[in-house]
Amino acid sequence: MIFKNKSKLILIIGGILVYLASAGISYGAFRFLGSGSSLLSPVDITPGSGFKIDPNAPKTEACPLTGQLFTKAEKQIWEKRRPLTVMIENHADSRPQSGLSKADVVYEAVAEGGITRFLAVFYCNASEEVTVGPVRSARTYFMDFASEYGDYPLYAHVGGANVPGPANALGQIGDYGWLDKGNDMNQFSIGFPTYWRDYERIGHAVATEHTMYSTTEKLWEVASKRGLNATDEEGNKWNAKFTEWKFKDDEKLEARGTTSKIDFSFWNNNPDYAVTWEYNKDQNQYLRVNGGQPLKDLNSDSQIQVKTVIIQFMKEKGPIDEVKHILYTTTGTGNALIFQDGKAIEGTWAKEKRQSRTKFTDGSGKEISLNRGPIWIEIVPSGQKANY
């Protein structure tokens, strides 16, 4: 091709050079952002900025959910979003799950047939992107627990119970205003790439129901696009009605107790779902054993460990319909056991209504201060025993 117009030729060549330069810059930028950076939200909450937390920075900022201390940079992250709750399954074939070690609070209860399920609450301890799953379906009583984290907590799940009557979780999501508000994070309405299936996640093929995955950052990104950050589009703060628990520091080593093991079952004769928490006195942590095996997080290959284990004994009803759904009486009062510092505290739980914070009190009626750090709450049917 021969160009007779030199000005035109110069413009074309200049355009090509600008394109190549910008492409090179973009390529370099994307390589930088993707080169091992498991970032989640940076301080300025710009996804993909490559921001990482300095592990040596002072930890001075208390998480409102657990009292655990984090850096100022991490606080800048969580202050710009709202808690994310995720339904994660615990079928024996789904283990090890992903993300549980990064949850601030985990609730565990039977979903059906003696098989338990988790509601994992992510907020302060997920400043870096956390892969979560397998994600499973909604249950009404887990929504009662999620409701403690604001009127419109982010609730991630894959479908849910959809039957006439009190177990109608999908119907209740609409009744609570979660569909209209947009805090319902149902995979059925969001889909790929926020959610995806991984059939080889644990090194071998598993049934389809054990394959749904997401990440905390992908879910928070969807929420942000819907105007649900720390405040909503009307300026309402997620924590305007949120009640914090009371927290305390660990007991000194010499003051710690000798309760070294906690054993219980949700249902009898169901060994795959029997739970043991083993106390490490030096670390002042409780390590989880499930079905006789250490329960690990697939992301890190580390055993699940928490600072406080709470057993809430709760009235179980059901099966209440032909598809064997069960319910728990999540409001009112009941007995509780609180394990921390190697000690067992016999107490009481109380919750006034769905959106109320569950409170834990000792025998004198005083609210129990919980150790700073991850908390695991076990919803065990009334009448079951815990050995310790």
Regions found by a protein language model. Give the residues of each.
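Hydrophobic membrane-insertion alpha-helices, especially the h-region
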Residues: 12-27
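A surface/extracellular/periplasmic glyco- and lipid-processing/surface-interacting theme
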Residues: 2-3, 10, 40-105, 112-388
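Short alpha-helical segments used as structural interaction elements across diverse proteins
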Residues: 3-5, 28
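Short hydrophobic helices that act as membrane-entry/anchoring signals
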Residues: 7, 11, 31-34
